Amino acid sequence: MAKRGVKLTLIGRRLRGAFNRRLVASRGVHTLPDRGSSGAAVAALRRGEVLAIAVDQNMRPSRGVFVDFFGTPACTTPAAAVYALRAGAPLIAAFPTRSKNRTHVVKVCGPFETSERGHRAVIDLTQKVTRAVEQAVRDHPDHWFWVHRRWKTRPPE
């Protein structure tokens, strides 16, 4: 995307290794740490940049909301929904898939909208994005793997 002139900001843990960090930066991708970046993330959206967040990771209850994922409650980051709502930006999901000729095709879903307000809007949008992830996994299970326990955090009884 950055190669095509789209400003892309990626939120996540700091990449290991100077080579990896230089590689990402050389592609025009700006990175933000996964903690303490909410102001910068919202500002990036308000500037019209694309903000990328991995939403298929297990979260601690203090940092996530429970939504349905493959029929099981999954504690999921609400960050994409929160930032989109704060910035007044559209919320979309994008899934790259590798084609037979070794290029990548990106499927874009959304924009996701809600008639809810406040915390209910965050949960509603997070559920909609999670459903899109679920469909992407169903469409291309060979493109997906988790190296962590996705459903580790359980909802309170």
Residue ranges and their predicted role:
Residues 2-4, 35-157:
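Non-catalytic C-terminal accessory region of glycerolipid acyltransferases
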Residues 7-35:
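Membrane-interfacial amphipathic helices and adjacent loop/beta segments
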